[in-house]
Amino acid sequence: MRVRGGQEAAQDKETSLDSDEERGRRGLRQTTLLDYMAGPAKPKKPEPPPTLHREREPESKYQNTLPETTGKEPASMSLRRNQPSSKHEEYNSESGDVRGLTLEPSPQSELSDDDVILELVREPWVESVRGYLLDVRYDGSLGKAVLMLYDPSSGSLVKWADRTGHKPYFLTDARPEDLRAAGVDVSHDESFLQYDLVEKFHPIDRKLVKLTKIVVSDPLAVRRLREKVSSAGFSVWEADIKYHHNYIFDRQLIPGILYEVGGVRIVHTLPLEMDDATRIVDEIFREEPREVRERAREWLRIFEAPPPKLPLIAFDIEVYSPIATRLPDPSTAPYPVISAATADSSGRSRVVLLYRDGVEFTEGALPEGTEVEIYDSERAMLLDLVRILQRYPLVVSFNGDNFDLPYIARRLEVLGVPREFAPIELKQDYATFRRSLHIDLHKLFGIRALQVYAFGNKYRELSLESISRALLGKGKVELKAPVSELNLNKLIEYNLQDARLTLELLTFSNNLVFNLIIMVMRTSKLGIEDITRSQISNWIRGLMYWEHRRRRWLIPSRGEIEKLSSAGARVGAIIKDKKYRGAIVLDPPVGIFFRVLVLDFASLYPSLIKQWNLSYETVNNPNCRDTIEVPEVGHRVCREFKGISNEIVGMLRDFRVRLYKKKSKDKSLREEERLWYDVVQSAMKVYINASYGVFGSEKFSLYSLPVAESVTALGRAVLRGTLEKSRELNLHIVYGDTDSLFIWDPPKDVLNDLVDYVERTYGLELELDKVFRAILFSGLKKNYLGITEEGDIVIKGMVAKKSNTPEFIKDEFSKAVKILSKLEKPEDVEAILAELRDHINTVYNNVKKKVYTLDQFAIKVMLSKNPREYDKNTPQHVKAAMLLQRLGLTLSRGDIVYYVKTRDKLGVKPVQLARLSDVDPGKYVEHVKTAFEQMLMAFGISWDDISGVRKLDRLLFDS
DNA sequence: ACAGGTCTATTGTAAC
DNA sequence: GTTACAATAGACCTGT
């Protein structure tokens, strides 16, 4: 039998690390392996039925090891806990007895306080393990990098402290004697370890350079010494890379895959080359050089490795608050946590409650299969909660970084638990557990690239409610009273629902989101806690840095890349508020067109990056002789060597287009495999779509304006060239935007000519995207309505489709669209127009008569900043927000304000304060007008031309 | 002083 | 990341 999770090793390690004090305590009662493993983390083991579940009791000896509480609670009560879940039926029938029961001491004790403490402070160190690498941390007290691995054989997370002797360092062009001569002899620094002479390839200078590696014992010393060295006029490199990242890059680790760690070796266990893998890769990359094909084979093994399945637990806490609308401040944690719910991936759910005078159970049933416990002592409750959470390798929260974790941590301090017994680590911008990993879904779903490319902009607000509504089709439990005033049944129901939603957001659709995270970790080479908290530019940075290290390339400094930027021809006129020129949007016609085909360039920008060898070191590099000029902007792209960005982007693009898009739809594969491949291709899509954007963003460490500028310039050239060719071929292009062309009723063979031309001339793939049976153009850019051959309706950019358009307009507009969808041939136009006219007349009258509800009149607009930060002017939604704030409601950045337009002087009112009689119909007529006009314009008529409307308007105005 | 007009800037949302 | 649109705020001008 296998050693379980290296637990034996863990014991050894503990002995060596423990202080005398801790050893002594363990002497009291040795925690058995079983105690530790008995947690719910073992997915296979069936859970005991709730009635058999018995919590360990009592906690009277707690005081021996933990300091006295601040005296807020009477000792006799604070240290005792009631009989748990098994009794909750009794509470139901005799709620009046809750108090009596809570004071009843339990007859049995299974776990002493020492065990509780031990479990809280113990760290699962191992010397060897076979497990999935999930993250790397830096442990300050050890002064070492620590691998966090999930061991599937024990179902738990283990830690492995570095034994490879890796140390923090940075690079400089100064030799040790130069530093001495310049009076910055860093070797006297207390953290200094040694100088190493290293040779690296400089990607811009295109030659090997000899550098001094200043090795230190402490990552903080890097920052300190870097300042010294650079202020003496020397160049420094790679000094701003976080140490735990440096460790991953240097050891060439791939988070998210299975490793065997032991001794000083960290070896991945990727599946050996599958027979057909070589064949597939050779086929896809047959035109690439040998090294690229070899790289591709390694990538393939990473993508093909199945994702880990690990036990997850989601949790959420509810805190008492005297002011219903305000959450207590986690930095002071002044009020008690009254409830905490957990839901795990094996289907188990628990709620722990704090006993409060006068707050009782009601008749209603409790959620099925849920273990409920009431505590007299908040401290015991929180410690138990943390203990349970820490048994899982991965804890999930919604906003845990900014609320739940800091609150619990601070609250435990307030309750007299010393910091070292509360295994929560509050980092600079996030919070986690000492022994578990933590994902905050609020941060994860706030990553814009995911929002847009992975979730198709389905949710707008970053709240648990709106995200789960959009992705799971269900929301939070609706409350009629503030959390602090709920009876216990409702509190349990509400709290638990939040925990369950949180869990489900990660696990729905066969672990879609979790698997996506794993895939992104593997690609970016960053740990799970980094990936889930950083924007895509950091993901790409991880991948690029890792790749630089693999090639033994020096990672250039911002300044070095910046220099190439100014070396460029730079002819483009400076555009106001913009850094560079973007894409072309063709002027659309006004009218209705039948049989319009849409062609688009498959991943235009990434393809251009690949085809044109665009990378920070290939554009405007003076160390390259053989260059080719980018039209319009005049940047010169190197042809002598292959760039790093385009190689990576090109590889991901090819994998996606040629392999994984197909695999995700391959019916011969098992459902689970297909879903995985869909995740793989989605992750690649996120990457390649962002690959162009990051070069134009200062936040990206390899920021290169010439690259971004060249991409868009080439995009324009390609679109223009294709347009010209279309004219030659007598194709009628009606519209186009960035990478698409709308062609009116083309002969089929001519279309093929165009596709061939694009392939030949630009090496790009032009694909048929859609065929519209009919399409309406309003004459506005990015604004059309089409009906495809299959009868699907495609609406782009129209006012009626925008999220800030009142609901009734959307409803009425979609009725109009239904009428329109009958449109098949030109002869239908007249009849349909007549029908539309009727409908619009009705709508007009309905608005004037206000037949809609207040909610339907609501305009929903997001606050892009906190209300007080609007200093230039005060938009309507901000005015409405301020009215709400006067009532004590706090509104902040990211919140959506619902308001109606009113007749009073201010002109707006939040829906919460408005009545239907406040609504100004005249202002809504204007709104309706713009919405429908975008449809009517295609028919060649304007709003005023709709007969009757004008008459009615006058009539109503006159009266 | 102020109503009503023009013009520009700000803001939010969407397409790509 | 840029391009594009709608709605509106606020500055400025003009006529009374």
From Swiss-Prot:
Give its E.C. classification number. Answer: 2.7.7.7
Keywords linked to the UniProt accession: DNA replication, DNA-binding, DNA-directed DNA polymerase, Nucleotidyltransferase, Transferase
Q: Name one GO biological process term.
A: DNA-templated DNA replication
Composition-biased stretches (Basic and acidic residues): 44-60
Q: What domain of life is recorded for the organism?
A: Archaea
- Is Nucleotidyltransferase tagged as a keyword? yes
- Asked if the record carries the keyword Cell membrane, the reply is no
Catalysis performed (reactions): DNA(n) + a 2'-deoxyribonucleoside 5'-triphosphate = DNA(n+1) + diphosphate
One Gene Ontology term of the molecular function aspect: DNA-directed DNA polymerase activity
The main enzyme category here is: transferase
Q: Do you know which Pfam families this protein is assigned to? A: DNA_pol_B, DNA_pol_B_exo1
Region entry Disordered: which residue ranges?
Answer: 1-110
SUPFAM superfamilies documented for this protein: DNA/RNA polymerases (SSF56672), Ribonuclease H-like (SSF53098)
The protein's matches in SMART domains, at most eight in alphabetical order, are given as:
POLBc (SM00486)
Concerning its family, UniProt says:
Belongs to the DNA polymerase type-B family.
Q: Which PANTHER family match?
A: DNA POLYMERASE 1, DNA POLYMERASE CATALYTIC SUBUNIT
What NCBIfam families does the record tag this protein with?
PRK05761.1-3, PRK05761.1-5
Q: What is this protein called?
A: DNA polymerase 1
| Annotated source species | Aeropyrum pernix (strain ATCC 700893 / DSM 11879 / JCM 9820 / NBRC 100138 / K1)
List the gene name. Answer: polA
